[in-house]
Amino acid sequence: MLKFQETAKCVGRRPTVIPMYPTALIARRYVLQQKLGSGSFGTVYLVSDKKAKPGEELKVLKEISVGELNPNETVQANVEAQLLSRLHHPAIVRFHASFMEQETFCIITEYCEGRDLDYRIQEYKEAGKVFAENQIVEWFIQLLLGVDYMHERRILHRDLKSKNIFLKNNLLKIGDFGVSRLLMGSCELATTLTGTPHYMSPEALKHQGYDAKSDIWSLACILYEMCCLDHAFAGSSFLSVVLNIVEGKTPSLPDRYPRELNTIMERMLNKSPSLRPSAADILKAPYMEEQLQLLMCKYPEMTLEDKNSVCQKEAAHTINAVQKKLHLQTLQALSDTQKTTPRERMWLRKLQAADERARRLKKIAEENYKENDKRMQALRSRNVGSVHAHVLHELDERTLESLPEPQSLPCLDLDELEPSLEDTIVDLGHYEIPEDPLVAEQYYSDVFDSCSEDSEEQEEEMIFSEAGGDTKEEESPSVYRTNQQDSDTAALVGCLEHVLGYTSLDTKTITNAVTDMSPGPMVFNSAVARTKMKRMKESAVQKLGMETFEEVYDYLKRARHQNAREAEIWEHLETVVPRASDCFEVDQLLYFEELLLTMEGKEPSLQNLPCEAAQKKPVKGTHFCDNP
């Protein structure tokens, strides 16, 4: 029987060369080199940074179209940029900048020359080779460190898989935060219909929510894939994969791998989220602590400055960044500002300073008016009901004595006001503008600002704060963030030292003595579900064509309603399309349609969604095999 294989995304595969225009620049500094593929909701390119240091020119540009969004709609891609800008860890893809370019939102990240982990796994599989045990454990530790770093800062990845993990200098880096979101409030769950089925946890498939333990499940699937070069939960169709995950037996590693490593993986694949260990718990296990010590001996001796951990403060920074409503108009205004020359930026700052000065003067005048009016009201209330004139006269004298002497406001001289306006927001310096054009251009470059990534990020943060209505707090240094001269290896050593610092004091074994506190069904967001199903349908139509899609859709719907056998379904699909696996998205679309009807309390059109296992034994707790 034909086995289902996940649709390739091209990321990490052989790059596709796109037409080049050497004179065309993106954001006046990035030159397109190659198209690398497609991410969660954007196209990825390899670019060359003309303003980068020697040896650091190559970077990755993710381009997300926002042309269809209304001006008041929040740009979801900005969430990914905000998250990446707060994450500084050797096991996480480094963020450089983000900006608007016409009708697209662009994110610049570091370039990983080793492509993605899925490409490396397929490469070894085709060559008939397997990864060495020490290499797998080293990569597994790197992923644990990265996931623990994210979870400490209350960030979920939500789409961990081998295609979203990249290699740079043989170090693994977690990327593609396109569907990431924060754990908000006391209910630390986030419902989702996203994710690759091979890596999705049972609670996510049963729509019971997604939390940090769901990332742990996905990480265990990646560990199995590195060891066995195959998916932990396979199947010929979407539903068979789902049933295997929800009701199937927990897979085990081959005997050539340590029993302790297999035990850890099995605990990570526990059907109950509360019984799965966290990334920090796994790093504290005796076997992992031993591997951490061996890994420390492997790397050369390096020294890093000791810094205190500030996880709580960084989590607050990240929550504030994502809670801000950054709209399309704000991003476009930022893009226009970045394209201006230093001279134009100077005049913009002068205008902003003048507006700020005017607002301050207006506020002072209003406060003085209110204070004077209050005093007049007090005088009138004292004089009401006075019978004798001499009493009124005495009250007036006492009141005048108690009042402070009036202070006159000086007249504003425009000649004196102009220089004060310039100093209100930004200090432009006490230099005269040179008359020579070349010297003047250098003056503008030195005094005002430059077009470097640092200056652009500072201006971006200023606009973010204006749009969000709050000010940016001073960031504290992180234990994982190192100086620019420190390599990823040096930063990784710092992470290992940090982990070993507390594992030696707090070592414990992963146990099953945890009470099962599985969460119940969560609130269903039908609008989000319909949007994702619409995109899923568009992708299937683009792949199969409208006529073929309708034929496959109608057949699968009838076949599922009649409880047809999987073998019969796939045999018929092979007569309609060249590869039956191309119909996976149609099958997935039908599943989500029935799930949506069930969650909305409507009668599903498919009374019994078919699968051979479901005919023998209904799956408890799932919406696709039990009638509502």
UniProtKB/Swiss-Prot annotation:
<dbReference type="GO" id="GO:0005524">
    <property type="term" value="F:ATP binding"/>
</dbReference>
<feature type="binding site">
    <location>
        <begin position="36"/>
        <end position="44"/>
    </location>
    <ligand>
        <name>ATP</name>
    </ligand>
</feature>
<dbReference type="GO" id="GO:0031573">
    <property type="term" value="P:mitotic intra-S DNA damage checkpoint signaling"/>
</dbReference>
<feature type="active site" description="Proton acceptor">
    <location>
        <position position="159"/>
    </location>
</feature>
<dbReference type="GO" id="GO:0005654">
    <property type="term" value="C:nucleoplasm"/>
</dbReference>
<keyword id="KW-0539">Nucleus</keyword>
<dbReference type="InterPro" id="IPR011009">
    <property type="entry name" value="Kinase-like_dom_sf"/>
</dbReference>
<keyword id="KW-0464">Manganese</keyword>
<keyword id="KW-0460">Magnesium</keyword>
<comment type="function">
    <text>Protein kinase which plays an important role in the G2/M checkpoint response to DNA damage. Controls degradation of CDC25A by directly phosphorylating it on residues whose phosphorylation is required for BTRC-mediated polyubiquitination and degradation.</text>
</comment>
<dbReference type="GO" id="GO:1901990">
    <property type="term" value="P:regulation of mitotic cell cycle phase transition"/>
</dbReference>
<feature type="region of interest" description="Disordered">
    <location>
        <begin position="452"/>
        <end position="475"/>
    </location>
</feature>
<keyword id="KW-0597">Phosphoprotein</keyword>
<keyword id="KW-0175">Coiled coil</keyword>
<keyword id="KW-0418">Kinase</keyword>
<feature type="compositionally biased region" description="Acidic residues">
    <location>
        <begin position="452"/>
        <end position="463"/>
    </location>
</feature>
<keyword id="KW-0479">Metal-binding</keyword>
<keyword id="KW-0131">Cell cycle</keyword>
<comment type="similarity">
    <text>Belongs to the protein kinase superfamily. NEK Ser/Thr protein kinase family. NIMA subfamily.</text>
</comment>
<dbReference type="GO" id="GO:0004674">
    <property type="term" value="F:protein serine/threonine kinase activity"/>
</dbReference>
<dbReference type="InterPro" id="IPR008271">
    <property type="entry name" value="Ser/Thr_kinase_AS"/>
</dbReference>
<feature type="domain" description="Protein kinase">
    <location>
        <begin position="30"/>
        <end position="288"/>
    </location>
</feature>
<keyword id="KW-0723">Serine/threonine-protein kinase</keyword>
<keyword id="KW-0808">Transferase</keyword>
<dbReference type="InterPro" id="IPR051131">
    <property type="entry name" value="NEK_Ser/Thr_kinase_NIMA"/>
</dbReference>
<dbReference type="GO" id="GO:0006468">
    <property type="term" value="P:protein phosphorylation"/>
</dbReference>
<feature type="coiled-coil region">
    <location>
        <begin position="347"/>
        <end position="385"/>
    </location>
</feature>
<dbReference type="GO" id="GO:0035556">
    <property type="term" value="P:intracellular signal transduction"/>
</dbReference>
<dbReference type="GO" id="GO:0046872">
    <property type="term" value="F:metal ion binding"/>
</dbReference>
<feature type="modified residue" description="Phosphoserine; by CHEK1">
    <location>
        <position position="274"/>
    </location>
</feature>
<keyword id="KW-0547">Nucleotide-binding</keyword>
<dbReference type="GO" id="GO:0106310">
    <property type="term" value="F:protein serine kinase activity"/>
</dbReference>
<comment type="subunit">
    <text>Interacts with NEK2.</text>
</comment>
<protein>
    <recommendedName>
        <fullName>Serine/threonine-protein kinase Nek11</fullName>
        <ecNumber>2.7.11.1</ecNumber>
    </recommendedName>
</protein>
<dbReference type="InterPro" id="IPR000719">
    <property type="entry name" value="Prot_kinase_dom"/>
</dbReference>
<feature type="binding site">
    <location>
        <position position="62"/>
    </location>
    <ligand>
        <name>ATP</name>
    </ligand>
</feature>
<dbReference type="Pfam" id="PF00069">
    <property type="entry name" value="Pkinase"/>
</dbReference>
<keyword id="KW-0067">ATP-binding</keyword>
<dbReference type="GO" id="GO:0005730">
    <property type="term" value="C:nucleolus"/>
</dbReference>
